[in-house]
Amino acid sequence: MNKKETVSYCLDNLKKAGADKAACSLNMTEKKELNVEIGEMTLFRTTFNSNMGMSVIKDQKKGSTLINKTDKNSIDNAIALVMEMAEGSRPDEAYDISEEQPPQSFSKGDKFANLDTMYQSLEEFVDYVNSTYPKINLEAAIMDFNHSRLFFQ
């Protein structure tokens, strides 16, 4: 399943499980990290993280959870859990989830890290600290770039 299909799968199955109203979100994050230790560039790494949030309202009772695995089995288990949570919660007339809206796409900032600029900026920072504050022993410095994509239904 692609990302949009994963969110649709979650929402469809929440409704099949008996939710009066439901919402699902999938957050995919990529982090580029550059580290300096004792004045030397020592590490460049890329990490990926994903999590899925789901909320349901059934009989004016609410349940919510967040998972970090997005395979069908994990989603199905979380759906069962969130439905149990809703059953066990206290009803509140104020609980609500907005009606479905037309799909939209939003963007802010750069989608990709400029690795050359990251390296150069961190190198300049280390040089600046060493020349301006010679008594300081810069043990560690980290520069990172984060990019997130959120799919919500």
Report each predicted region and the residues it spans:
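Basic/polar N-terminal segments that are highly enriched at the extreme N-terminus
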Residues: M1-N2
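Acidic low-complexity segments
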Residues: E5-N13, K21-K31, D76-Q153
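N-terminal alpha-helical targeting/anchoring segments
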Residues: K32-E87
